[in-house]
């Protein structure tokens, strides 16, 4: 289903709760993704047809392992993740164009969501500037 939305949205971030995050995107052949090949261990698929069409990338990031007893409140964890991704994209608007910067963006977002899961608040106060 997400692939069917790519003509309308270049990047999709699908929050999967305790299963992690799925990024589905189309990127230009001028990005670093052009030199990547699908990597099952890396949890991503890179597909590009012939010619000058965009590349489609599906990348799964598993959730951080967190003992059940350390989870205080799930409210706001997904919102925290999305807010962190958006804040990273403000700093680096081309962050999705490079596999390493995408990994860093999602890792930071998952770390922020983990802080919120361990907090009694909807957003962990430790995330405030």
Can you annotate each of these PLM segments?
Residues 1-129:
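Conserved phosphate-binding/catalytic region of the ribokinase-like
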């Amino acid at each position: 289903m997400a692939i069917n939305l790519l003509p309308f949205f270049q990047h999709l971030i699908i929050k999967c709760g305790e299963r992690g995050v799925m990024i589905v995107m189309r990127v230009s052949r001028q990005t670093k993704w052009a030199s990547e090949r699908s990597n099952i261990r890396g949890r991503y698929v890179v597909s590009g047809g012939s010619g000058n069409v965009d590349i489609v990338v599906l990348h799964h990031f598993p959730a951080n392992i967190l003992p059940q007893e350390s989870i205080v409140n799930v409210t706001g964890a997904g919102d925290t993740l999305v807010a962190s991704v958006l804040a990273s994209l403000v700093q680096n608007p081309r962050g999705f164009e490079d596999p390493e910067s995408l990994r860093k963006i999602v890792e930071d977002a998952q770390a922020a969501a983990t802080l919120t899961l361990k907090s009694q608040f909807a957003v962990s106060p430790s995330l405030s500037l």
